[in-house]
A protein has these predicted regions:
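Extended, subdomain-level signal for the structured scaffold at the beginning of enzyme domains
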Residues: 1-77
Length: 77
């Protein structure tokens, strides 16, 4: 079974804390889903880089994931 990882992102997230794990996990053929905590799928990170999430966090069935990767940033305070 292929592991599944959820990466929720919110406005102001630290891009490197999201993109590096996503890249490495996908290279390892792990299924990674990016979920927006915002009202839009496009989420702007701390440095102005915009990431398009796969779906909204509210639509995610958390029980189906093996791991959560939680990027930091001003949005987490």
């Amino acid at each position: 079974m292929i592991p599944k990882v959820l990466v929720p992102i919110a406005h102001g997230f630290e891009e490197i804390e999201a993109t590096c794990p996503i890249d490495l996990l996908r290279r390892a053929e792990v299924e990674v889903l990016i979920a927006s905590c915002e009202s839009k799928l496009e989420v702007c990170g701390r440095s102005g880089i915009v990431i398009r999430a796969d779906q909204f966090l509210r639509e995610s069935d958390l029980i189906q994931f093996d791991l959560l990767v939680l990027p930091g940033g001003p949005a987490v305070f």
